[in-house]
């Protein structure tokens, strides 16, 4: 790439936390299914406890419904991880005079192109508390701020400042919010 192009990858849903949650839901769902089947068949299919001693109606049946709910949730989580929803890139091309923000969606990619002349500033937003928000956004003339950072776990403050300053320097615009 030339010095007139800056490309930033954006992490999507392929994060360790999502893998751990999807794995836990899958294992829990299989456990509930085995407990439900154990109560129906009258044989212990799970090495822990004695689920065969459970009465199938209502306890075994409810565990079967829990396993169905877990299977649906796990399918959704593994699909989101496989597609890498939210992943993509931010591409700033001075030669073409355009900012291209691309993300992977559920069904189709999301592509936003903004002329560089419409970018007024780079905004660094820091809000601490229960619902913390740390993000870098583009302040665009005539539009709402366009977020550039990943969704989920907040970035460290030093990394946020570094990314914002680097982008503002590259684009030749002001850095706001610090």
UniProtKB/Swiss-Prot annotation:
Transmembrane intervals: 19-39, 61-81
Main location: membrane
Entry membrane topology: Multi-pass membrane protein
Record's subcellular location: Cellular thylakoid membrane
GO cellular component, one term: photosystem I
Record key words, sorted: Membrane, Photosynthesis, Thylakoid, Transmembrane, Transmembrane helix
UniProt-listed GO biological process terms: photosynthesis
Protein family according to the UniProt entry: Belongs to the Ycf4 family.
Physiological role: Seems to be required for the assembly of the photosystem I complex.
NCBIfam families: PRK02542.1
The name this protein goes by in its record: Photosystem I assembly protein Ycf4
Organism: Synechococcus sp. (strain CC9605)
Designated gene of the protein: ycf4
